[in-house]
């Protein structure tokens, strides 16, 4: 039924001088002539099935390019969709993979981040989910892999965030949050604290009574 519907609607759309664009579920049946496929499931690899049939495609994998997901530890973040796509996850994504067939790169139209707004009640909620990850998306789209440098990007982000402050845009500061993982070891728990920013200093205490921030020395 999906294939029949897409064949009919594809013919109609083309008769109006327009292009058909659709999600990668189209690869499960008939793909309209000339249709552009958006690869979203998992890492977007279903779009490559369309490329094998000569179709152009856009990479927008849910695992790293769905901006509705949390940007850091969920207990620090406003309620949104499940899963984490940190600023670093977005920045490190490379749409062109080394194991691709040579013709795939020529059919790739670009990369896209997607945002669904069922958890956004105000424009400010959209700002929080989009910024600063939108800057990382720009780096993915415009920078070659060998040109990317996470540390330099963070320095640029500090200046960019000052610009957002001036504009009154309420961006996420999740890049400064501390993530912890706990692992059972010999009847005890081993705790690992980490931050996606290497310049963040992590201080802690084993004292259960909080009185003031931990001293530097």
Model-derived segments and spans:
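C-terminal functional modules
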Residues: 120, 138-198
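Polar, glycine-rich mid-to-C-terminal structural blocks
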Residues: 54-58, 65-70
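Conserved small/polar residues in nucleotide/adenosyl-binding loops
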Residues: 210-217
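Conserved, mostly hydrophobic/aromatic
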Residues: 13, 37, 134
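Hydrophobic faces of well-ordered beta-strands that scaffold small-molecule active sites
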Residues: 20-22, 37-38, 57-59, 109-113
């Amino acid at each position: 039924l999906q294939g029949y519907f897409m064949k009919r609607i594809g013919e109609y759309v083309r008769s109006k001088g327009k292009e058909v664009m659709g999600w990668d579920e189209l690869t499960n049946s008939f793909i309209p002539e000339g249709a552009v496929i958006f690869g979203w499931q998992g890492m977007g690899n279903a779009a490559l099935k369309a490329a094998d049939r000569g179709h152009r495609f856009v990479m927008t994998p849910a695992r790293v390019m769905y901006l509705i997901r949390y940007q850091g530890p969920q207990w620090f973040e406003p309620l949104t969709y499940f899963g984490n796509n940190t600023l670093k996850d977005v920045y490190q994504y490379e749409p062109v993979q080394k194991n691709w067939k040579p013709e795939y790169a020529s059919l790739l139209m670009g990369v896209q981040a997607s945002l669904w707004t069922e958890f956004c009640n105000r424009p400010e909620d959209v700002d929080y989910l989009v910024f600063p990850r939108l800057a990382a998306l720009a780096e993915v789209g415009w920078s070659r892999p060998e040109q990317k440098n996470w540390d330099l990007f963070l320095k640029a982000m500090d200046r960019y965030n000052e610009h957002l402050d001036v504009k009154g845009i309420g961006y996420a500061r999740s890049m400064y949050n501390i993530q912890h993982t706990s692992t059972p070891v010999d009847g005890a728990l081993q705790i690992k604290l980490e931050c996606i920013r290497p310049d963040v200093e992590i201080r802690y205490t084993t004292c259960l009574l909080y009185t003031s921030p931990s001293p530097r020395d």
